[in-house]
């Protein structure tokens, strides 16, 4: 099964949230029993959902295409609206995605998935320009999350 995984760091030195180092093209395996949100190698079916596992608004992150090669357990976090999340005991780091890969992927997303991406990924001013105008709601998310316009979602009610 293919998916996406987020790491902290840069393309030359990246690790998971527990400090375990990874390299592109390598296969990793654990002998531990796997449990969602606890042990094993976690990944998501959709790139934007990997952002749940890293702080891409504040830290340098790497997103990789991965392939699960072992036992897989599916789970979801319905409370926060995350579905198609997985944990495996054996994973291959197929490819480090470039920034261009990530932005191209996001530009093709439907609005409801693009909202999550905009909320959780730090974008440069040049990248923001690529997303502005896609919809009025996306514009509001950009203003709120990237330009700290805290009033953008306030609704003005007119008195009778």
How would you label these PLM feature ranges?
Residues 1-160:
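Short, glycine-biased loop/turn motifs at secondary-structure junctions and
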């Amino acid at each position: 099964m293919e998916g996406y995984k987020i790491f902290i760091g840069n393309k030359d030195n990246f690790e998971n949230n527990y400090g375990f180092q990874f390299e592109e093209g390598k296969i990793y395996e654990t002998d531990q029993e796997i449990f969602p949100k606890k042990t094993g190698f976690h990944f998501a079916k959709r790139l934007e959902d990997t952002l749940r596992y890293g702080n891409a608004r504040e830290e340098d992150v790497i997103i990789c295409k991965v392939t699960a090669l072992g036992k897989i357990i599916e789970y979801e976090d319905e409370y926060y609206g995350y579905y198609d999340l997985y944990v495996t005991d054996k994973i291959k780091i197929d490819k480090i995605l470039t920034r261009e890969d990530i932005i191209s992927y996001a530009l093709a997303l439907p609005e409801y998935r693009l909202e999550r991406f905009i909320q959780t990924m730090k974008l440069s001013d040049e990248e923001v320009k690529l997303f502005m105008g896609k919809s009025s709601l996306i514009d509001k998310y950009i203003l709120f999350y990237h330009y700290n316009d805290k009033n953008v979602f306030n609704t003005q009610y007119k008195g009778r």
